[in-house]
Amino acid sequence: MVFYFTSSSVNSSAYTIYMGKDKYENEDLIKYGWPEDIWFHVDKLSSAHVYLRLHKGEKIEDIPKEVLMDCAHLVKANSIQGCKMNNVNVVYTPWSNLKKTADMDVGQIGFHRQKDVKIVTVEKKVNEILNRLEKTKMERFPDLEAEKECRDHEERNEKKAQIQEMKRREKEEMKKKREMDELRSYSSLMKVENMSSNQDGNDSDEFM
């Protein structure tokens, strides 16, 4: 089971936030995450794994402040220890930065690059945020593998279409260049012929 929430800011469209029911489900979330996903977890404490799905083309720096705080509050609220504390640090990083090795426990992860891990601090619990998110909560039993494959398939098709469009434009540019070269060549030829014609005319002039 995966829990889904909706978050939005004044200046952006809605974002999807999701988290697994337990550490075993987290394994599938880690395995079938998307490149657009940002992973959240309470720093140095046990907590839920919360993911934010960015819009295509966005980066971690583009996360609206309100949406960032929604994710941070949600992960804090789903930490047995963190939910009782103030000034809790929450780490977040792109899904692609998560590292999972065979010797790690269920639900445990590391990072490929520590420099890509960011921190946001939740000073204290804000019920207004949690209540608003709770109203958007949905429970689903998704086929994460199938959804990931569908997403990857669409991306492959988009890239294929982009390559085809690029080739079409290159072909069009080459055609235009060839036509311009032919036109210039024809113009030069006409110029030479005109000059020859004028010279022939001058040679035959007779002055009385």
Swiss-Prot record:
Function per UniProt: Transmembrane receptor that senses neutrophil extracellular traps (NETs) and triggers the ILK-PARVB pathway to enhance cell motility. NETs are mainly composed of DNA fibers and are released by neutrophils to bind pathogens during inflammation. Formation of NETs is also associated with cancer metastasis, NET-DNA acting as a chemotactic factor to attract cancer cells. Specifically binds NETs on its extracellular region, in particular the 8-OHdG-enriched DNA present in NETs, and recruits ILK, initiating the ILK-PARVB cascade to induce cytoskeleton rearrangement and directional migration of cells.
Pfam families associated with the record: NFACT-R_1 (PF05670)
Parts of the chain on the Extracellular side: 1-105
GO cellular component: endomembrane system; plasma membrane
Cytoplasmic topological intervals: 123-208
Subcellular location: Cell membrane; Endomembrane system
Family: Belongs to the CCDC25 family.
Protein name from the UniProt record: Coiled-coil domain-containing protein 25
Region (DNA-binding): 21-25
PTM-bearing positions, type N6-acetyllysine: 23
Modified residues (Phosphoserine): 204
Compositional bias per record (Basic and acidic residues), positions renumbered to this chain: 145-184
Gene Ontology molecular function terms on file: DNA binding
Source taxon at top rank: Eukaryota
InterPro entries xrefs: Jlp2/Ccd25, NFACT_RNA-bd
GO annotation terms (biological process): positive regulation of cell motility
Subunit details: Interacts (via cytoplasmic region) with ILK.
Segments traversing the membrane: 106-122
Spans annotated as Disordered: 145-208
Keyword vocabulary terms for this entry: Acetylation, Cell membrane, Coiled coil, DNA-binding, Membrane, Phosphoprotein, Transmembrane, Transmembrane helix
Coiled coil location: 117-187
Membrane topology: Single-pass membrane protein
